[in-house]
């Protein structure tokens, strides 16, 4: 089999890249290790930056998002007993974020892929990348027990942190930057109305809290917990009680509890590799970078990578511009590091660090008072939260 662009991974970044390239008349084949049901079963973030929303619209897959998604013009912070609203739109010349779950984004992209008739192969195994430095790289893989070979011009590695794409790059090429945070997030999804119209980020001496939502009838809550905790030790009742202990009474009185649809503990990690390309292999999204979820940047940074890569490939195929191929890594990384910085900043600002000394604790408190107590500080948070601009490719 032959194609122009081979895409490894059928998560939202791989599907979005495939859709944009398909719309531009560029042939793609997507390979995915899991089943469609497994991919849709992943519970992930649900906050879309304004630039991500625009990219989904550009791809022609935003009809349901625009009909069912919730536009948020603000967000709220809690600390030291204070509730601090952040007027996102007022502070960013009218920009906003969209509450629309990653599962729904993936569902829409899957439907668009199926409607296009463009090939996608699920359930592949033993995926291997060959000759990435040549002008005709190939991928071999097993599908339904048969060894298959896919020839292509370019490979997009959209297969996540544990995927084969990054691992296929020879040792000594990539520089890794990593920080593992000393706590995790315990998340609970429930079919209950959100406790607040806007998302709430709360600092508390017992640990950070995020009150999020997927719709007007589905809520997502997170608690900072020790890495040693096991999800089996957290009954629904224990979760709700701990959540109440970290929220003010005015919110507790409005909190609707219920049976959990999903509950899990996720470790927090900051991770980047440089460069994000090796020959004609391009790393996209989690294959190249991971952020703690505090800044809602994971899916949005993946979409940012897609934005740069699809435009570079369009220029190559439509205008013969091979000079832009080498620019992908630097373009993507410039925005990745800004997203990493904001995620690091939000995590440092709002979590409880048991091992920090008294001076660091005072500095953390001073940061909260400054950033959440001045228009300049609130503007910094707002412009990063709604998403920084993407550089033009051509």
Report the location of each language-model feature.
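Extreme N-terminal starter segment of soluble prokaryotic enzymes
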Residues: 2-5
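Conserved mid-domain beta->alpha element of the FAD-binding
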Residues: 8-23, 109, 262-345
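Active-site-adjacent segment of FAD-dependent monooxygenases/related oxidoreductases
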Residues: 41-44, 49-116, 130, 340
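Conserved FAD-binding catalytic core of PHBH/FMO-like flavoproteins
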Residues: 111, 118, 124-128, 132-264, ...
């Amino acid at each position: 089999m032959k194609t122009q662009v081979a895409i490894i991974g059928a998560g939202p970044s791989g599907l979005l890249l495939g859709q944009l390239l398909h719309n531009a008349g560029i042939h793609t084949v997507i390979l995915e290790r899991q089943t469609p049901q497994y991919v849709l079963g992943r519970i992930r973030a649900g906050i879309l930056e304004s630039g991500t929303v625009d990219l989904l619209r550009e791809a022609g897959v935003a009809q349901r998002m625009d009909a069912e998604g919730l536009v948020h013009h603000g967000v709220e912070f809690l600390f030291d007993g204070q509730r601090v609203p952040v007027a996102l739109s007022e502070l960013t010349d009218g920009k906003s974020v969209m509450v629309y779950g990653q599962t729904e984004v993936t569902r829409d992209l899957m439907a668009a892929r199926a409607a296009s008739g463009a090939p996608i192969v699920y359930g592949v195994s033993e995926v291997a990348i060959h000759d990435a430095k040549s002008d005709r790289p190939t991928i071999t893989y097993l599908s339904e027990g048969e060894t298959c070979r896919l020839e292509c011009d370019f490979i997009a590695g959209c297969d996540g942190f544990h995927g084969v794409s990054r691992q296929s790059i020879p040792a000594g090429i990539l520089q890794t930057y990593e920080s593992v945070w000393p706590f995790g997030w315990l998340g609970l999804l429930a079919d209950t109305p959100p406790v607040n119209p806007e998302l709430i980020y709360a600092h508390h001496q017992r640990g950070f809290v995020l009150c999020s939502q997927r719709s007007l009838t589905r809520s997502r809550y997170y608690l900072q917990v020790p890495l040693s905790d096991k999800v089996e030790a957290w009954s629904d009742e224990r979760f709700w009680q701990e959540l109440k202990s970290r929220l003010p009474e005015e919110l507790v009185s409005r909190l609707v509890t219920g049976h959990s649809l999903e509950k899990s503990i996720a470790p927090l990690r900051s991770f980047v590799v440089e460069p994000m390309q090796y020959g004609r292999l391009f790393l996209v999204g989690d294959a190249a970078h991971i952020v703690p979820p505090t800044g809602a940047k994971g899916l949005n940074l993946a979409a940012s990578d897609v934005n740069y890569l699809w435009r570079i490939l369009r220029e190559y195929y439509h205008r013969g511009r091979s000079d832009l191929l080498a620019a992908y890594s630097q373009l993507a990384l410039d925005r990745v590091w800004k997203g990493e910085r904001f995620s690091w900043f939000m995590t440092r600002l709002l979590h409880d660090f048991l091992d920090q000394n008294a001076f660091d604790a005072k500095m953390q408190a001073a940061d909260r008072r400054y950033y959440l107590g001045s228009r300049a500080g609130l503007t910094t948070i707002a412009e990063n939260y709604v998403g920084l601009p993407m550089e033009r490719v051509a």
